[in-house]
């Protein structure tokens, strides 16, 4: 390439700036080669196809199961692998060629916020490095919008309210879930004039629900995470103004023409429509 790619220091070697550029482009090239091989093999009828899925937790438990069932019913010979990862990690896997489709989500930027700025907070060190990953250059297939709702213990004095503003919970102890969600909730709370006191954080949504039900605090969670909410433990209250995240299926543009990937995307969209209808059918007011 006409310029050194490695620099040596004693027994060690590291990439030069030119080497880092080449390595970054190489991962994209390898991913495109993998897609080309898959497409050629499918067209030639050498094998039925394989789809590697990565999804965030609440997507794995709601959208993914009916989509996989529909795919198996239509094309039982298609192989599918599934793993879980946060959106930043899932997108990195997609760019590195380690998966074919990544389910991800992101929240809209707040007015006055720097685009892409990481919302770290001293009470929440787990958010560091979890800023929303860049979707540039990826093919995004919209699936649904997922709003956040308030969770209160049954005996809470606001449990019977028809709606809540986050400021109504300013003096409460908060229990929040995944890093991306709690980072955005903290940003919204701070924009309304207070910082939530987070004594407990966990990426496990059933744990959040259990802690709220036990009276340990209040929470705000995505509706998708509440699809199997046990009855009689917590009270759901809509948050105003509405806070919602965009849920999408991401893939590389080169993968969209691979038959198995294209079919999986179709079934993900159908499953997402059903999930959205199920959310609209809850006891909460219409979305």
For the regions a protein language model found, what residue spans apply to each?
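Alpha-helical linker/hinge and terminal dimerization helices associated
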Residues: 1, 22-44, 268
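A short LG(V/I)-centered, amphipathic sequence patch enriched
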Residues: 1-15
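Flexible hinge/capping segments at coil-to-helix
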Residues: 113-120, 124-148, 152-174
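Central regulatory/effector-binding core of bacterial HTH transcription factors
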Residues: 48-131, 135, 202
